[in-house]
Amino acid sequence: MRTFGVEEELLIVDPVTGEPLALADALLTGRKLAADDAPDKPRILDPHDPTRDDGDTGLTAELKLEQIETQTRPCLNYEELLLQIRQGRALADTAAEKHNARVAALATSPIASTTHTTPNPRYATMQERFGLTVHEQLTCGFHVHTFVESPEEGVAVIDRLRDKLAVLTALSANSPYWNGVETGFESYRTQAWNRWPTSGPSQIFGTHSMYRRVVTRLLDSGVLLDEGMIYFDARLSRNHPTVEVRVADVCLQAEDAALIAVLVRALVESASREWRAGVDPAPVPTVLLRMAAWQASNCGLRGDLLDFGTFRPAPAEEVVEALVDYVAPVLAEQDELELAWEGVRRILDRGTGSEQQRLAMQECLAGNPEAAAGLAAVVAHAVDVSMRRTEAVTAREKAPVLLRVRQS
């Protein structure tokens, strides 16, 4: 069974107004800045903080000071991963509460605000080169790492799951509001994110050597700062023996996040088996995949998606069910088929995070017609749901971190 782990980006917010707060540095006080893009000399300001892991840490800096990233260790099953997601959220929220703030699993901010880029040389260069794209990039995604035995297997997996990733965007959609505006999208984060030069679906590579040639040519173009800006929907991790899938919004419910990860792991295993059986990847044009991603971002589960077999419109529920059917043999072997169906039906019945945000807005406006009050209520609802059933991290528990992800 392959191990898997996740990274969640969370919004730091004022618990009353809902406004994003530039407090990431404060939340990381006493912890190493362990993100890939952290400065070369991480600060340790309070070595006696009982929530600090003496190795890496479960909280890391991101592009914006209004967000914080949590990371899990590699896990073997849904229950273990769900627990670590909850612990990571609790760790971040506990740190935020020390500064009269909270964290919320929101993929974009419903409240308009001025954002602040995390101060380090790399981000400063990105700000200078990419301008408004960086300024407006307060987006929170959900990244799933799944073990692969080799880069060759990883590229084969990427080639064979690329046509199915838009379904995960629809399932995880959690960003209908953007800076005080109802966007009309279910995952507006996807729209904001896809302004980067390399973001979105990638071509079929065929071999690891071709993958490396493409990456090298992108770097040689001079447009990108470094390999960290290879933002494909699915890519080989630079730091772990994993495929990293990057298409999902951060999910309101921790249970939904763990479900997305389970589906990703099953997709990776299914793709690997196809590769080993000599099944070629579906030759879907990249431009068609971009359209499928756009449709998923726009409609979520409320309308039609592009079926990943025919790429013709089909009811979202049918496309989601087809995805579960596709990975059902792997899920059954891993004793996760029933929980996957339960999780998918829960989202279909209850609605995505975007639908829940809109409902919170409507319920508030029924008693208070001011839009600002409604958006603040959306954030307050998100804080409550994000932390629901989340277990506090005690001094005896290590902060969750993404270590080497392996197969057992």
UniProtKB/Swiss-Prot annotation:
Keyword vocabulary terms for this entry: ATP-binding, Ligase, Nucleotide-binding
Top-rank EC class of the record's enzyme: ligase
Signal sequence bounds: none
EC identifiers of the protein: 6.3.2.2
Region (Disordered): 37-57
Substrates-to-products reaction catalysed: L-cysteine + L-glutamate + ATP = gamma-L-glutamyl-L-cysteine + ADP + phosphate + H(+)
Pfam families membership: GCS2
Biological process, per Gene Ontology: modified amino acid biosynthetic process
Keyword Nucleotide-binding: yes
Molecular function as annotated in GO: ATP binding; glutamate-cysteine ligase activity
Compositionally biased residues, Basic and acidic residues: 37-55
Described purpose of this protein according to its UniProt entry: ATP-dependent carboxylate-amine ligase which exhibits weak glutamate--cysteine ligase activity.
Family: Belongs to the glutamate--cysteine ligase type 2 family. YbdK subfamily.
PANTHER family per the UniProt record, alphabetical: GLUTAMATE--CYSTEINE LIGASE 2-RELATED
Listed name of the protein: Putative glutamate--cysteine ligase 2-2
Upper taxonomic lineage: Bacteria, Bacillati, Actinomycetota, Actinomycetes, Micrococcales
